[in-house]
Amino acid sequence: MTLTLAVYGKGGIGKSTTSCNISTALAKRGKKVLQIGCDPKHDSTFTLTGFLIPTIIDTLQEKDFHYEDIWPEDVIYKGYAGVDCVEAGGPPAGAGCGGYVVGETVKLLKELNAFDEYDVILFDVLGDVVCGGFAAPLNYADYCLIVTDNGFDALFAANRIAASVREKARTHPLRLAGLIGNRTSKRDLIDKYIEAVPMPVLEILPLIEDIRVSRVKGKTLFEMTESDPSLDYVCNYYLNIADQLLAMPEGVVPNDAPDRELFTLLSDFYLNPQTPVKSQEEELDLMMV
């Protein structure tokens, strides 16, 4: 049985870097993995392959849009740790519908029977869920993962994505596996959000410069660790996420917070910060100093 994952989150939050490292972690656990980039920028799999692979749209144009002339090897490229990679691509800037391209990519891969060849398929999807086309991967996913940080905007976007998961779960066996906190030294705002909208937190990745550098180098953290073993501890974050997913967690159908309520909840966190209450011992220590 194929495990299908869909990774969403605010634009620029680090979804692609996170996705590539999760895909690699799953491959390190012995799984055959396909990662599908669903973004017109077509850079989802750059960290796995080290270059911008041709997109399905590029290939269709070369074949004059004759779908029957396309073979799996025309659109699937081998990445690090044996992870297979596909990029949907998109229409020219300012023209056409990127969401439609995502839907067509899924359709083509199903016609090629590509979905049957893998233990895990991971969709890395553009930013927020802005239309039905970009929500299409949720129709095929077992779990949605939301990448966020400890900030207002990313959690506001996460809430909208949670609403899409809830809507799709009405007609599909879809669950939210949980949040992944990325590039954050704190999690207090994340904790405040999940108090209002209960959902699991799979992992919190601290602000580690090497994660950003890996993106620029076009390498996963696992590949960088081969020449710098001190980075092994970073890989353990992604292996932990992979192990949780392979255990087939129960997940949740989230109840998103209404926009205005969430706006008030999150903004209040900044405008009215809670001052931690000091214990008597702490007060005495302060007086002695």
UniProtKB/Swiss-Prot annotation:
Binding site for [4Fe-4S] cluster: 97, 131
Assigned keywords, A-Z: 4Fe-4S, ATP-binding, Chlorophyll biosynthesis, Iron, Iron-sulfur, Magnesium, Metal-binding, Nucleotide-binding, Oxidoreductase, Photosynthesis
Pathway: Porphyrin-containing compound metabolism; chlorophyll biosynthesis (light-independent)
InterPro entries assigned: NifH/chlL_CS, NifH/frxC, P-loop_NTPase, Protochlorophyllide_ATP-bd
Cofactor note: Binds 1 [4Fe-4S] cluster per dimer.
Cofactor field: [4Fe-4S] cluster
Catalytic activity annotation: chlorophyllide a + oxidized 2[4Fe-4S]-[ferredoxin] + 2 ADP + 2 phosphate = protochlorophyllide a + reduced 2[4Fe-4S]-[ferredoxin] + 2 ATP + 2 H2O
Residues the record lists as binding ATP: 12-17, 41, 182-183
SUPFAM superfamilies per UniProt: P-loop containing nucleoside triphosphate hydrolases
EC number: 1.3.7.7
Molecular function per GO: 4 iron, 4 sulfur cluster binding; ATP binding; metal ion binding; oxidoreductase activity, acting on iron-sulfur proteins as donors; oxidoreductase activity, acting on the CH-CH group of donors, iron-sulfur protein as acceptor
Sequence positions that bind Mg(2+): 16
GO biological process annotation, one example: light-independent chlorophyll biosynthetic process
Family: Belongs to the NifH/BchL/ChlL family.
Role, per record: Component of the dark-operative protochlorophyllide reductase (DPOR) that uses Mg-ATP and reduced ferredoxin to reduce ring D of protochlorophyllide (Pchlide) to form chlorophyllide a (Chlide). This reaction is light-independent. The L component serves as a unique electron donor to the NB-component of the complex, and binds Mg-ATP.
NCBIfam families the record matches: DPOR_bchL
HAMAP family linked to this entry: ChlL_BchL (MF_00355)
Subunit structure: Homodimer. Protochlorophyllide reductase is composed of three subunits; ChlL, ChlN and ChlB.
Protein name per UniProt: Light-independent protochlorophyllide reductase iron-sulfur ATP-binding protein
Taxonomic source organism: Rippkaea orientalis (strain PCC 8801 / RF-1) (Cyanothece sp. (strain PCC 8801))
Gene that encodes it: chlL
